[in-house]
């Protein structure tokens, strides 16, 4: 006989959606991570969609078209489709301008769904607050639950802002509060992020699910360091510290370059492209290396494919993640899966992604001297079991496990949605409605 808890667990698991709409307004899952606004969220959206499709859930991902050459519909694989919605000009729109295009984007999403019979989607999963605004309306129009993943919060980013970086606007905080109030379930990467949602936005803890992101354990594996170094023209006998990510103040690649000045003989490998406020001075990092007199020890590479990125991790002795804010840190997990220890800032989800003193070192400050000391220490200690422990640690973060946890959250969202409705929120009535479909109209 099943216990009450086990019966409830199986009942929720049985509520698996057939088809979901995933909203990612500001960045496409098909974009190359490390360029523009493409980063860990792109990887998350695509990899979870692929895993959900393998579990029998069809996934339509809606994103804003950014080129006239974008096909309206792109089939990624059986069960995963990307739909490029025209909303505003293709080029020249900053992410901070996108709230002006939310009406156009949402209209495009609703029109795409309107050609189908009612009930085509069983659930909406929005990523980032812009998508949450669109998802809120789609949820009410379609009569299905809304699951939301914030990925980052304006208040958290502003509390840990890099010097000279642009703060998040107040309107984002208002928009995030609305989405938190309206979402049926909230997905976070770590308990720390859950606590932030509760303390900053007064989220109901009962509606929050902690779901760790994953890593592709088939791509990111240990490999031949000598071959990897040869691929990038690195000497076999030099010490290499790599940075992978968007080049912007938030990610703090300049901190690594400054630390390298204090570490004679250490080569820094920077992999990524300018993004966000980093676009204001696209050559600032190169100029810094010149000013410090270490330009000959700093190598720059453009964003890489996943397979080439795995080679970057294998070529490095250490991967550095000096971000001022990081909700999780996929780069840290990918590097460890390749057997490379990590030096990371002790912020956000990085203390979960990196096991301090076992798979790498966590640095509690952003002082150059502290980072130079930590990197120097790990370069000396890296042979003391760090690589083996890193691989073992990363093995606990698979996209397969992430997808299973998402399905459990979806099941709870569907179960709660079918249950008696909660009272209206402070923002608006939660009443579900579906517009009457008018035949004979050309869209």
Swiss-Prot record:
Enzyme's top EC category: transferase
Protein name: D-inositol 3-phosphate glycosyltransferase
Residues that coordinate or bind Mg(2+): 313-314, 316, 340
Pfam families: Glyco_trans_4_4, Glycos_transf_1
E.C. designation(s): 2.4.1.250
Residues holding 1D-myo-inositol 3-phosphate: 26, 37-42, 95, 128, 152, 172
Keywords, in A-Z order: Glycosyltransferase, Magnesium, Metal-binding, Transferase
Membrane-spanning residues: none
UniProt family annotation: Belongs to the glycosyltransferase group 1 family. MshA subfamily.
Organism superkingdom: Bacteria
GO biological process, alphabetically ordered: lipid biosynthetic process; liposaccharide metabolic process; mycothiol biosynthetic process
Binding, UDP-N-acetyl-alpha-D-glucosamine: 32-33, 40, 246, 251, 304, 326, 334
Claim: Transferase is one of the keywords in the record: yes
Catalytic activity: 1D-myo-inositol 3-phosphate + UDP-N-acetyl-alpha-D-glucosamine = 1D-myo-inositol 2-acetamido-2-deoxy-alpha-D-glucopyranoside 3-phosphate + UDP + H(+)
Molecular function terms from GO: acetylglucosaminyltransferase activity; D-inositol-3-phosphate glycosyltransferase activity; magnesium ion binding
Organism: Mycobacteroides abscessus (strain ATCC 19977 / DSM 44196 / CCUG 20993 / CIP 104536 / JCM 13569 / NCTC 13031 / TMC 1543 / L948) (Mycobacterium abscessus)
């Amino acid at each position: 006989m099943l216990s009450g808890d086990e019966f409830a667990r199986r009942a929720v698991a049985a509520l698996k959606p057939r088809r979901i709409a995933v909203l990612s307004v500001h960045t496409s899952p098909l974009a190359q991570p490390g360029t523009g606004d493409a980063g860990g969220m792109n990887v998350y959206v695509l990899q979870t969609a692929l895993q959900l499709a393998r579990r029998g859930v069809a996934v339509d991902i809606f994103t804003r078209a950014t080129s006239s050459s974008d096909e309206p519909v792109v089939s990624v694989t059986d069960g995963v489709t990307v739909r490029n919605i025209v909303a505003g000009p293709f080029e020249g729109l900053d992410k901070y301008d996108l709230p002006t295009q939310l009406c156009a984007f949402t209209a495009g999403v609703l029109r795409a769904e309107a050609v189908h019979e009612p009930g085509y989607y069983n659930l909406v999963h929005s990523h980032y607050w812009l998508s949450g605004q669109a998802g809120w309306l789609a949820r009410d129009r379609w009569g299905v639950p809304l699951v939301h993943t914030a990925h980052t919060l304006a208040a958290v980013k502003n509390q840990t802002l890099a010097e000279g970086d642009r703060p998040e606007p107040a309107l984002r905080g208002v928009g995030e509060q609305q989405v938190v109030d309206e979402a049926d379930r909230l997905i976070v990467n770590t308990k720390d992020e859950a606590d932030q949602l509760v303390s900053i936005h007064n989220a109901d803890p009962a509606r929050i699910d902690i779901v760790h992101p994953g890593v592709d354990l088939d791509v990111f594996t240990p490999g031949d360091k000598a071959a990897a170094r040869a691929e990038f023209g690195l000497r076999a006998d030099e010490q290499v510290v790599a940075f992978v990510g968007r080049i912007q103040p938030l990610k703090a690649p300049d901190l690594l370059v400054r630390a390298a000045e204090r570490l004679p003989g250490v080569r820094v490998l920077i992999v990524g492209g300018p993004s966000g406020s980093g676009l204001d001075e696209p050559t600032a990092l190169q100029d810094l290396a010149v000013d410090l007199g270490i330009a000959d020890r700093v190598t720059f590479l453009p964003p890489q494919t996943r397979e080439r990125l795995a080679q970057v991790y294998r070529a490095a002795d250490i991967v550095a993640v000096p971000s001022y804010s990081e909700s999780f840190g996929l780069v840290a997990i990918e590097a460890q899966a390749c057997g490379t220890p990590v030096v990371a800032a002790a912020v956000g989800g990085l203390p979960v992604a990196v096991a301090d003193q076992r798979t790498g070192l966590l640095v509690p400050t952003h002082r150059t001297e502290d980072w130079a000391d930590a990197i120097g220490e790990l370069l000396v200690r890296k042979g003391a079991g760090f690589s083996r422990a890193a691989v073992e640690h990363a093995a606990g973060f698979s996209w397969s496990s992430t997808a299973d946890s998402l399905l459990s959250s979806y099941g709870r969202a569907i179960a709660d949605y079918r249950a008696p409705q909660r009272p209206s929120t402070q923002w608006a009535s939660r009443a579900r409605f579906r517009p009457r479909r008018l035949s004979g109209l050309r869209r």
